[in-house]
Amino acid sequence: MYLMSQTLDVHSINRNGILIRGLIILLCAGIINATSVFITPLATYYGWEASAIANVGTTMLTFWPIGSLLGGKLLQKFGGKAVTIIGAIVFGAGLILTGLVPDTAPGLLYFTYSFLIGMGNGITYCGAMYCVMGWFPDKKGLAAGLCMAFNGGSSAFLAPLCAYITAAFNVKVTLFSCGIVCAVICILCGLGMRSAPLVYVPEGYVAPSDGAALSSQYESYPISKAWKTKQFWLQLGAMAFFPSFYLIMFSRFSMFMTDKGIDLAYATLGVSLYNIGNVVGRLLLGKLTDNLGFKKVYMCCWLLCMICGLLLLTGSSVAMILLAYICLGAGFGATNSVYPVMSTTSFGPVYAGNIYGFALLGYMLMTQVIPRITAATIESTGGYTVAFIMAFVLCTLGVICGVLIPKLERPRLKETESV
């Protein structure tokens, strides 16, 4: 295993430098959140229906958790440098090759766009995030919050930038250019990434008065041990059920408002406010996990999602729906900062990325189930009421799973093992 077979002078490594490199990598990886701007231009170029191209994007989201799982496995075997470079190459190749797919073979998009981009981005995301978090056992929430804020917030400027390049040239040029730029930047940053040593304690760290040790000072559980614990299955349940409101709304933000007769300009504003809430929630609530613990912050996320659901179900004004979008952005967005802390707290930092990837399989299943149930209920009832009631139940089931996760008593490591 990489973490036990290499030697590293910890004092020669600036953990803030690792953080900055990781944030830049995650910023580039965040382009996956802006891929909706490619749907209409690609549909026009290939002569497909927009819904068919959107299905290519949905398939990409199915491969993404698998890439994340693989990224966590590669991180523990080969370290942060190797995994981020591998992810950058695969992810960049997906964008570049999508830009080269001829109009006579649009089916190749399922390989270049769905498979390569999805897998490569998942590898990059998980590898960079958990590599960074390994260096901040004393500030897990802040590190996760920064990573998620940069990753989620990048679409705020990447989406309009990609749209501008597409309008000025064409979508093929945009994809090709983005692939080269993202790959080069991520590879250069990846060259400076290093995994933290076992039992790593930051220089100058002062232990709390109660004598509690950092999670890195206890034995880390591999997935072969983790999956036998109730902590793993409760986390999988939390990650599967909690995002219900998001999975209902993520492809319907604009449609929901226009269906209510609200002007499209407000619908666009709603998406922007959702993104702002998402970034703020990831950063601020992520930081709060260091002070309050992940369970209390997770309950705050649930409360925000409940407020969102009530506003969506009963709201008749533009202001109420816009507020619902902000609450959903903050509530769901912050869970992306909570889950990494949940994994490292229960199982330690060494295998947390791999465990996180396995727990994402529950979410992956729900990305296929909930949107289909939503579409069927909307078609049969003509409204969202049934779908929202389902979301209230599932989201509540998710938070129950999260807050019921008991502390896992792991053996304390007596000696520092460096990498």
Give the positions of each predicted feature.
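Interfacial helix-cap and linker-helix signal at transmembrane-aqueous boundaries
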Residues: 42-43, 74-75, 160-170, 257-258, ...
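Hydrophobic core of transmembrane alpha-helices in multi-pass small-molecule transporters
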Residues: 106-123, 320-333
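Extracytoplasmic gate region of multi-pass secondary transporters
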Residues: 35-39, 224-285, 370
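Intracellular juxtamembrane helix-capping segments at the cytosolic ends
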Residues: 42, 123-136, 143-144, 334-347
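Helix-loop-helix hairpin linking two adjacent transmembrane segments in secondary transporters
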Residues: 151-198
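Helix-to-loop junctions at the C-terminal end of transmembrane segments
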Residues: 67-80, 282-293, 378
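C-terminal ends and interior cores of transmembrane alpha-helices
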Residues: 89-103, 304-316
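C-terminal transmembrane helical hairpin of 12-TM major facilitator-type secondary transporters
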Residues: 245, 266, 272-278, 282-342
